[in-house]
Amino acid sequence: MDAVAAEPVVAPVLPLPAQVRDLGMQDYAPVWRAMQRFTDTRDEHTGDELWVVEHTPVFTLGQAGKPEHVLAPGEIPVLQVDRGGQVTYHGPGQLVVYPLLDLRRLKIGVRDYVCKIEQALIDTLDEWNIVAERRDGAPGVYVGGAKIAALGIRVRRGCTFHGLSFNVAMDLEPFHRINPCGYQDLQVTSVLDLGGPSGMDAVKAVLLDQLARQFGLVLQPTSALPDLSLPA
């Protein structure tokens, strides 16, 4: 009898666990320093995490940011940070998610990573029949020409930090004090202004579910917060 070669056994791709930490309302700088520390000290055994937060009012300038795009900040502080991109605004009513993911473990590149975040946002908005789209060369998500979500990321040793900001139900006036993402007269909008819910929890739940679906994650909420102390 002729021998029949056995088919190779292919292990199924299992969903990967990721802890979700809801930080509540926080100043920007302590969270930024904490995710830097997390990324600098992690290794191949460190689990992935998603940090969810609302920030007190702040403008952040990315590595490509130009001071001339900060038009009239007034009382709102401006921070130069180490993410990609230009200038943006964070404030109450905006959902910010920092995916701290090992792209090597997920077996995806940076371009796919960005596309997956954008798709998660687009699918989240579809939950409320809001039609959103991405733009070539201008990362983020747009509705009818107005930006509703911004992306600013950093990848170090194959691991991501920084992330996305999603305008849910916020005062959009501070965006008029800058050229958002470096674009003069770029319009911005929010989920609430487009007929979606005002509640942060409802939007948060859908977005986290969509991010888990895009990246193949099993989310594990935890009440433990990262160390948010600033270095002396």
Curated annotation (Swiss-Prot):
Which SUPFAM superfamilies does the record match to this protein?
Class II aaRS and biotin synthetases (SSF55681)
What Pfam families does the entry give? LplA-B_cat (PF21948)
Q: Which reaction does it catalyse?
A: octanoyl-[ACP] + L-lysyl-[protein] = N(6)-octanoyl-L-lysyl-[protein] + holo-[ACP] + H(+)
Which family does the entry's similarity section mention? Belongs to the LipB family.
Localisation: Cytoplasm
Name all BPL/LPL catalytic domain ranges.
44-219
GO molecular function, a single term: lipoyl(octanoyl) transferase activity
Catalytic residues, per the record, are C181
Instruction: Kindly tell me the pathway this chain contributes to.
Output: Protein modification; protein lipoylation via endogenous pathway; protein N(6)-(lipoyl)lysine from octanoyl-[acyl-carrier-protein]: step 1/2
Enzyme Commission number(s):
2.3.1.181
- GO cellular component terms, semicolon-separated: cytoplasm
**Further remarks about this protein from its record:** In the reaction, the free carboxyl group of octanoic acid is attached via an amide linkage to the epsilon-amino group of a specific lysine residue of lipoyl domains of lipoate-dependent enzymes.
Q: Binding residues for substrate, per the UniProt record?
A: R83, G84, G85, Q86, V87, T88, Y89, H90, A150, L151, G152, G163, L164, S165
Known function = Catalyzes the transfer of endogenously produced octanoic acid from octanoyl-acyl-carrier-protein onto the lipoyl domains of lipoate-dependent enzymes. Lipoyl-ACP can also act as a substrate although octanoyl-ACP is likely to be the physiological substrate.
Q: Which CDD domains does the record associate with it?
A: LipB
- GO BP: any one term: protein modification process
Q: What is this protein called?
A: Octanoyltransferase
Please report the organism this UniProt entry assigns to the protein: Xanthomonas campestris pv. campestris (strain ATCC 33913 / DSM 3586 / NCPPB 528 / LMG 568 / P 25)
PROSITE patterns assigned to the protein according to its UniProt record, in alphabetical order = BPL_LPL_CATALYTIC (PS51733), LIPB (PS01313)
Its keywords, alphabetically, are: Acyltransferase, Cytoplasm, Transferase
Q: Where is this site: Lowers pKa of active site Cys?
A: K147
Question: If you read the UniProt record, what top EC class would you report for this enzyme, in one word?
Answer: transferase
Q: Which HAMAP family match?
A: LipB
